[in-house]
UniProtKB/Swiss-Prot annotation:
Residues 149-169 are annotated as: Disordered. InterPro entries: ATP-cone_dom, NrdR-like_N, RNR_NrdR-like. Disulfide bonds: none annotated. GO terms for molecular function: ATP binding; DNA binding; zinc ion binding. The lineage of its organism: Bacteria, Bacillati, Actinomycetota, Actinomycetes, Frankiales. Its cofactor is Zn(2+). This is Transcriptional repressor NrdR. It comes from the Bacteria. HAMAP family: NrdR.
């Protein structure tokens, strides 16, 4: 590492520590030429691949802006949005890939947002999942109700989910998509 003071091409690492809850490494360095010390931060880059094929750095701020629109008029604090964005980044980074699809970021938002506020979840899901009809909303609401009643994850559109019935038997709930998308298939 080049010394920022004397431009000597080499430096020695004196100390290394985790920073930003393990997302980065803080290194204290010493220059053998001038003897001055300086700090560097190392962080693995995470890039998001958009539908157009272009890539850009992952941004918690963009996650917050997108989710804030869904939360307008809802009792959701800025701190809650910051924590949600942090959880989304942790989820996306846990994939181990340096580049993730924008769709994966959207999917990572859905779970924490559902826990935070169901109305905001429906608003976000309606845009992210491209709801086209009232039936899409009804299916999403039915999935949320099923989750509340059964305490489990809501079904994914078009994917059957087995829920225990009161009689001990099981019922299969399949969210139905109506309109032009229904003919296209999953």
């Amino acid at each position: 590492m080049r010394c920022p003071f004397c431009r000597h091409p080499d430096s020695r690492v004196v100390d290394s520590r985790e920073a930003e809850e393990g997302a980065a490494i803080r290194r204290r360095r010493s220059c053998p030429a001038c003897g001055r010390r300086f700090t560097t931060m190392e962080e693995a880059s995470l890039r998001v691949r958009k539908r157009s094929g272009a890539t850009e750095p992952f941004s918690r701020a963009k996650v917050i802006v997108g989710v804030r629109k869904a939360c307008q008029g809802r009792p959701v604090r800025s701190d809650d949005l910051a924590l949600l964005a942090e959880r989304v980044e942790e989820t996306v980074r846990s994939s181990g890939s340096a580049e993730v699809a924008a769709e994966d970021v959207g999917r990572a938002i859905l779970g924490p947002l559902r826990e935070l506020d169901e109305v905001a979840y429906l608003r976000f899901a309606s845009v992210y999942l491209a709801f086209e009809s009232l039936g899409d909303f009804e299916a999403a609401i039915a999935a949320l109700r099923a989750e509340s009643a059964g305490g489990g994850e809501p079904p994914v559109a078009g994917k059957p989910t087995t829920m225990p019935a009161a009689t001990g038997a099981s019922a299969v709930i399949v969210p139905v998509t109506t309109g032009p998308r229904a003919a296209a298939g999953p």
